[in-house]
UniProtKB/Swiss-Prot annotation:
The histidine box domains may contain the active site and/or be involved in metal ion binding. GO terms for cellular component: endoplasmic reticulum membrane. This is Acyl-CoA Delta-9 desaturase. Its cofactor is Fe(2+). It is a multi-pass membrane protein. One of its GO terms (molecular function) is iron ion binding. Keywords: Fatty acid biosynthesis, Fatty acid metabolism, Iron, Lipid biosynthesis, Lipid metabolism, Membrane, Metal-binding, Oxidoreductase, Transmembrane, Transmembrane helix. It comes from Acheta domesticus (House cricket). It catalyses: octadecanoyl-CoA + 2 Fe(II)-[cytochrome b5] + O2 + 2 H(+) = (9Z)-octadecenoyl-CoA + 2 Fe(III)-[cytochrome b5] + 2 H2O; hexadecanoyl-CoA + 2 Fe(II)-[cytochrome b5] + O2 + 2 H(+) = (9Z)-hexadecenoyl-CoA + 2 Fe(III)-[cytochrome b5] + 2 H2O. A motif (Histidine box-2) lies at residues 133-137. A motif (Histidine box-3) lies at residues 274-278. Belongs to the fatty acid desaturase type 1 family. Catalyzes the formation of a Delta9 double bond, acting on saturated fatty acyl substrates like palmitoyl-CoA (hexadecanoyl-CoA) and stearoyl-CoA (octadecanoyl-CoA) with higher desaturation activity on octadecanoyl-CoA than hexadecanoyl-CoA.
Amino acid sequence: MAPNITSAPTGVLFEGDTIGPAAKDQQAEVNAPEAKKPREPYRRQIVWRNVILFIYLHLAALYGAYLAFTSAKIATTIFAIILYQVSGVGITGGAHRLWAHRSYKAKWPLRVILMLCNTLAFQNHIYEWARDHRVHHKFSETDADPHNATRGFFFSHVGWLLVRKHPDVKEKGKGIDMHDLEQDKIVMFQKKYYLILMPIVCFLIPTTIPVYMWNETWSNAWFVATLFRYTFTLNMTWLVNSAAHMWGSQPYDKYINPAENLGVALGAMGEGWHNYHHVFPWDYKAAELGNYRANFTTAFIDFFARIGWAYDLKTVPVSMIQRRVERTGDGSHEVWGWGDKDMPQEDIDGAVIEKRKTQ
């Protein structure tokens, strides 16, 4: 029930209280067609400004990749790779695991660092990113999912950014509880000044540093360190929404689309273990195993946990994982070898044992 709404008499006289039964029936007939009016079917509305922008970004990124191998200084290419890692952490460790899922807590110095890293990534401010991601998890693979993977690879990868949001996305987004982010002064500071911070952090600084620090050309700095880096980071993030919802194993829940995808995990800094993540979205590792090689974000969080800047790290006990694997998994859960309690009986029965020991 909404606040301040009760069934007790209030003393307020509404229009319906002043008319007789006959008039009420007549009024109901007038209002009935409006109440029963069918909902208009959703019609995709292309945002041509975004289409043109993303075409330019990808053409510029291809040119930037060419320059990285032909004329750009090695320092510029290395700088672009570092910025990709830094901005990626702003999404994975910041907007995603910290603010969208609250899988751990961070002291203000770390939150400031993650906010700046997130601004470098330029994927909307933290507040909007987290809200849309919470909607994605609560209404995954439905019309209320901002990047509904059932609408195809292209839509879930980038197409969702080229059209107006489905009405269900907007409607469900309004019902998402965002009070925790609204109380975070760092998040709200970024939201308020985003249109000032983002151009400076994402475009201006990455372009000027190579020019003034190691005498790079403006063209190489712009196309390699800025546009190639930015567009590459975007696509790595998008692969989580597209590829990781289509291809891979489902050891934790075979009834949902998200899957375990090593390639995506490597490119998206640990976000490719997506079947696990959708089953246990509150685990700060976003994976069952804390393998740093395929989950750089977990290494980042663990480092700051050691120095006390990250704390209250939430994870899942082995027993809970095992119960879920047995109940809904597809049988692809990893085993360490012969005799592992997770080894399927059909594998045991079908195995061939050669050179058996004789008495």
